[in-house]
Amino acid sequence: MDSNTVSSFQVDCFLWHVRKQIVDQELGDAPFLDRLRRDQKSLRGRGSTLGLDIETATHVGKQIVEKILKEESDEALTMTMASTPASRYITDMTTEELSRDWFMLMPKQKVEGPLCIRIDQAIMDKNIMLKANFSVIFDRLETLILLRAFTEEGAIVGEISPLPSFPGHTIEDVKNAIGVLIGGLEWNDNTVRVSKTLQRFAWGSSNEDGGPPLTPKQKRKMARTTRSKVRRDKMAD
């Protein structure tokens, strides 16, 4: 096992512990709490994959951080902070929409790279809006926290979320997953729109009809998903 992978996990565990203390003292805002919950799931998945105990890793991570801070000067810290671009947290969804539990009548789940796509195949003939919470850097989507598909009545009918055991994803991963989700929803004659905020930071532009400007590759992926479903339906008949 790569030593850098282990030390990175150990430091992440300790930093999560520090952030948890901030929340316990009621010093964190909603986005801070949201990231804390998501990172907790990610750390559990990574710990299981690496075969490492989180509590032990947290103690080792503390030692690593303390050693770095002991050697770090205030001047070097200031220079590092000044030269590092800051991420922004974008919220399409309210805290209630983000944390709400939802259930599927006809569940369908698909893993697309490091992302998990869930869709309720029982939903038909609905107007659906895709909304997401994510971080942005250099005016481009950096990390997807959670994407959900809402009907006009406010019901959740689809979702894209990062896999806890597979940390890290690119903007292309997110766009490909959105293409698969849209293809699945449109198959049942639903009309799908993407929020202007998500269009802006994922594609750098927006369409008046709310449709994302998918690339030819993403359109082919949607077409393959549709053809595969047609074949399965014919076999079932």
Swiss-Prot record:
Positions of short motif Nuclear export signal: 137-146
SUPFAM superfamilies: Ns1 effector domain-like, S15/NS1 RNA-binding domain
Principal place of residence: host cell
Region feature PABPN1-binding, mapped onto this chain: 223-230
Region spans: Disordered: 204-237
Keyword Ubl conjugation set for record: yes
Motif annotated as Nuclear localization signal, chain positions: 34-38
Amino acid composition bias (Basic residues), ranges on this chain: 217-237
Keyword rRNA-binding belongs to the record: no
Cellular compartment(s): Host nucleus; Host cytoplasm
CC per GO annotation: host cell cytoplasm; host cell nucleus
GO biological process, one term: symbiont-mediated suppression of host mRNA processing
GO molecular function: protein serine/threonine kinase inhibitor activity; RNA binding
Region called CPSF4-binding, residue ranges: 180-215
UniProt similarity note: Belongs to the influenza A viruses NS1 family.
Comment block on domains: The dsRNA-binding region is required for suppression of RNA silencing.
Subunit structure comment from the entry: Homodimer. Interacts with host TRIM25 (via coiled coil); this interaction specifically inhibits TRIM25 multimerization and TRIM25-mediated RIGI CARD ubiquitination. Interacts with human EIF2AK2/PKR, CPSF4, IVNS1ABP and PABPN1.
Record function comment: Inhibits post-transcriptional processing of cellular pre-mRNA, by binding and inhibiting two cellular proteins that are required for the 3'-end processing of cellular pre-mRNAs: the 30 kDa cleavage and polyadenylation specificity factor/CPSF4 and the poly(A)-binding protein 2/PABPN1. In turn, unprocessed 3' end pre-mRNAs accumulate in the host nucleus and are no longer exported to the cytoplasm. Cellular protein synthesis is thereby shut off very early after virus infection.
Annotated protein name in UniProt: Non-structural protein 1
Source organism of the structure: Influenza A virus (strain A/Memphis/110/1976 H3N2)
